[in-house]
Structures are given as structure tokens and as C-alpha cells.
């Protein structure tokens, strides 16, 4: 789903119009480029009528929280950091296909007691063409999506980020929550997520890939790399990395075989896709 090609200033004007029509917003900030850009744009459009909320949990990469805190301090945001409590939700922890529904249900439920403002998310136009059970939770909680309302896609978000001075953050790669690395049906385990995060940082340091994901599947651990990095990986380094990955998991009493594959978006989801009911 593509938005018409427009200049960054035109898209920013459309976004400003949506935000001003809302009046007062509470931005759910994950630490990714979409929500950071929305928060920065809202601060400029609405001044003091904006608050930001960031949730921390074992599924949130520490660097996402640190990035959010740094931008908030620099931009003068009113930021609340909270625990959304999804790790106390059995439905979330059993990791069903619609796990994101339970994650967002907990997130929006945790934000609501702190504000009477309209809660908004960084969902953009491209997201509507993907499997996003979190959008069902957003609808149930009355959350609005200003980028969607302004017909702005991912490319437009990055253009706006550059236009409003977010600098190198405009090129920030996508980095979904750590629970997205665990195959559907394998229970979420905080210690396992720590291992996943540590391994991804290890591979980033050693190989400098454009993209890396450490997936935990029923058949073992899969290190997914962008095609160029995978093609250039010699057998010797692959073997050494395999041993280090296995050792990290074994240190936490997990035993897995390790393989390397080309990066595929959302490959930890099982292949079937069933509709998420409008609970």
C-alpha cells in the first residue's frame, strides 16, 4: 500500500494537520524510527499538549530504551517509562500467532491511567498491508495512527525525520521486539530473550552485517543475515560463530543446533496465517 509521492514538507504539513485536529496526544514510543519521528513531529506541532510513553520489558532491546531517553532529553519531551506488564500475561507468554495483540493490549492498558489525551501510535501506511494483530488491540483501545490518517508510508516517515532534524536516526533500521525472534508456539522466556539479544550484538560486532536476526525455532537456532553478508561468510568463521552461539545458549541451559540462513521478514511466524478476530 503506497502513498502518493510528496515532498517531506507537504507530508509534514499533512501530519501537522492531523495532530492539530486531535489537539492533545500521548505518543506510544517504542524507540524505532516511526514512533520517534511521530513524537518529534507532535512536540513541534502541539508544544506542551504532548506526552510520550515508553514501555520496558525483557522483549525491548536496551538500546531502544536508551535511544528513547536520549532523544527525549535532547528534544525536551515529557517522557514516562513504564512496565506494560505483558510478561505477566499468560496469553502473551505462550506466544500464539497473535502475540502482538496481547502485547499492545497490555501497553495501551498501561498508558491509559496516566493520561486523558488521545493515544497515538507510529503505525504508517505500509504497515496496513502486513499481518499486524497489534492493530486490532489499537482499535479496541481507540488508538489513532496519524501517519496513516495523513497517508504517509515508511519512506515518508524517514523523509520527515530528516526534515525535522533527527539526523542519522532517519536511517535507523527496523528492529522489532525480541519476542518476534521466537517461533510461534514456543513459550516466551526472558532468559532466552537475553541470549538472543547477546548473540545479535555478538554477530553485529564480528561480521558488521546490514541485518541480523537470531531466530529460535523448533528445529534449532537460525542466524539470519542479509544476503551479501551471508554469501561472504567463510566456513571457518561460520564454524567459530556456531560454537560461540551454542555456548551462550548452553550457559543458560538451552541446547540447540545452529544454522545460518538469508534474512526473511517475519520468518519466526509459522507459515499459516489465520485472521485475528475482532475481539
Residue spans of the language-model regions?
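Short, conserved beta-strand edge motifs with alternating hydrophobic and charged residues
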Residues: 119-122, 171, 179, 224
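ATP-dependent adenylation/nucleotidyltransferase module used to activate substrates
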Residues: 2-163, 221, 239-253, 262-278
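A short, flexible beta-alpha/helix-coil linker loop
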Residues: 87, 183-185, 228-230
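A short interface-forming secondary-structure element
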Residues: 218, 222-237
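Mid-to-C-terminal catalytic subdomains of enzymes
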Residues: 148-214, 260-262
Amino acid at each position: 500500500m503506497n502513498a502518493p509521492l510528496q515532498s517531506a514538507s507537504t507530508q509534514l504539513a499533512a501530519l501537522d494537520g492531523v495532530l492539530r485536529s486531535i489537539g492533545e496526544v500521548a505518543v506510544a514510543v517504542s524507540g524505532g524510527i516511526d514512533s520517534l519521528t511521530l513524537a518529534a513531529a507532535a512536540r513541534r506541532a502541539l508544544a506542551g499538549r504532548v506526552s510520550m510513553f515508553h514501555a520496558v520489558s525483557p522483549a525491548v532491546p536496551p538500546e531502544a530504551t536508551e535511544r528513547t531517553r536520549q532523544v527525549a532529553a535532547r528534544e525536551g519531551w515529557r517522557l514516562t517509562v513504564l512496565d506494560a506488564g505483558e510478561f505477566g500475561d499468560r496469553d502473551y507468554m505462550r506466544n500464539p500467532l497473535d502475540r502482538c495483540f496481547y502485547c499492545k493490549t497490555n501497553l495501551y492498558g498501561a498508558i491509559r491511567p496516566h493520561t486523558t489525551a488521545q493515544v497515538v501510535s507510529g503505525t504508517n501506511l505500509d504497515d496496513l498491508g502486513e499481518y499486524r494483530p497489534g492493530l486490532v488491540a489499537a482499535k479496541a483501545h481507540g488508538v489513532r495512527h496519524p501517519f496513516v490518517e495523513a497517508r504517509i508510508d515508511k519512506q515518508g516517515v524517514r523523509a520527515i525525520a530528516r526534515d525535522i532534524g533527527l539526523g542519522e536516526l532517519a536511517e535507523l533500521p527496523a528492529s522489532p521486539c525480541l519476542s518476534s525472534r521466537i517461533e510461534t508456539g514456543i513459550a516466551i522466556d526472558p532468559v532466552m530473550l537475553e541470549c538472543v539479544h547477546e548473540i545479535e550484538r555478538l554477530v553485529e560486532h564480528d561480521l558488521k552485517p546490514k541485518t541480523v536476526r537470531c531466530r529460535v525455532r523448533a528445529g534449532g537456532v537460525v542466524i539470519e543475515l542479509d544476503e551479501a553478508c551471508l554469501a561472504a561468510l567463510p566456513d571457518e568463521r561460520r564454524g567459530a560463530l556456531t560454537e560461540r552461539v551454542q555456548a551462550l545458549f548452553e550457559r543458560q541451559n538451552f541446547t540447540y543446533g545452529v544454522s545460518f540462513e538469508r534474512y526473511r521478514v517475519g520468518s519466526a511466524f509459522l507459515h499459516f496465517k489465520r485472521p485475528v478476530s475482532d475481539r
